[in-house]
């Protein structure tokens, strides 16, 4: 197996390769003055199984184009298979038409990945369990929930705590985590979002958090407004303490500032997306998924 990395998250590729006891193979990635990219495979990879890491977070278009070029270069260089490890799958929320006249952006991404030679895909905590159905190639859908359960146990939060989904779409995720924590109680926040602006107009809650530690769990944090709205409802309903867990640290706009100013004690994310120094804040703690990816690749 040969492992390669795009530009978006080299530390995750290196750590995952280390877990497998191998080195990341070199790639020449150069950028022309006009911004176009050129990819060149350096090593002989004829008949080799290859893996390429690339999170397609900000800037998603640039990261996807680089991934397409890498996959094409690997196949042209004789790789027997190309497995794309895309820990955060950009455009995954655009998986259907919300309003007339829209493109289904994720379908375009899927078709392109398959067309350029990707044979298998590894992703983490997809926004919808239906996303893998869009692919004709095998998809390994990994999750950070076991890592979250482990951290919750380490913090001694298995008693007098409630898992909270910040929206109705995360109920399945919360139920799975609840089961791994001995059927920990859970609550859900219902929110109404404007499809044009993305603004959350109002929220309500189902479940009891009064006097308890509320543990918000989501697949991603983008603008941070969903977490802010959820915290407001939880405090209103008597939550004693609040912690936040999310797989993907998208952190768009002023999300880091909003999260730092939460009443929540800690915000836990994973390294599916590389969080730059300017987006880090004192309440943030990053949990690595490198071992989970390495174990997944062994049998995929």
Language model regions located:
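PRPP-associated nucleotide enzymes
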Residues: 1-300
